[in-house]
Regions:
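Two-component/phosphorelay signaling modules centered on CheY-like receiver
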Residues: 9-28
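Short hydrophobic/Thr-rich beta-strand motif most characteristic of the beta2 strand and flanking loop
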Residues: 24-31, 36-39
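Acidic catalytic/metal-coordinating carboxylates
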Residues: 31-32, 58-61
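Active-site beta3 strand of CheY-like receiver
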Residues: 43-49
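Receiver (REC) domain active-site loop signature in two-component systems and cognate sites
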Residues: 54
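Alpha4 helix (beta4-alpha4-beta5 surface) of REC/receiver domains from two-component response regulators
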Residues: 61, 82-97
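C-terminal output helix
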Residues: 85, 103-116
Length: 155
């Protein structure tokens, strides 16, 4: 999975990146939200892990923009508190998951597994839609051919 990590604290970014890499993720680490958003605009990302409170843009601003740029991105917000944003508001604005500080690395691994499973389901859905489209296209062509033959037979 391609994972973008955004936190204004370098040690946290490093720790998250280390765990994600051990889980097989390709990691894009950032400490500046502007740089992260520029990267999101040009590179497909499967998972966005972002802190809620940062100096330039808060996590919700980043999540909203990420979902605008990449609607299927899975987002995980890490926060120490929710007083500014109730959980319901976070979820309504596109956050897929929330993890509260302090957290254990096993909790992070569980969240990464959930994101990976979701990515797999989305990929499978796209494959099934493509296959369904191909089958329906063939059926329509067959029906159109039958209609042409029936029309020609009546003339």
């Amino acid at each position: 999975m391609r994972t973008l990590i955004l936190d204004d604290e370098e040690p946290i970014v490093h720790m998250l990146a280390k765990v994600c890499e051990k889980e097989g993720h390709t990691v894009f680490p950032f400490t500046q939200s502007v740089d992260a958003l520029i990267h999101l605009a040009s590179t497909p990302i499967d998972l966005l892990i972002t802190d809620m409170h940062m100096p330039e843009h808060d996590g919700m601003t980043v999540v909203r923009e990420a979902r605008r740029l990449q609607p299927n991105i899975f987002t995980l917000i890490i926060t120490g508190h929710t007083s500014r944003y109730p959980i319901e508001d976070l979820m309504a604005d596109g956050t897929a998951d929330i993890m509260f500080k302090p957290f254990h690395m096993n909790e992070l691994r569980t969240r990464l597994a959930l994101a990976h499973r979701r990515r797999g389901l989305i990929d499978r859905l796209h494959q099934e839609k493509k296959a369904l489209h191909a089958v329906s296209h063939e059926m329509i062509q067959g029906l159109e051919q039958e209609l042409r033959e029936a029309t020609q037979g009546k003339q």
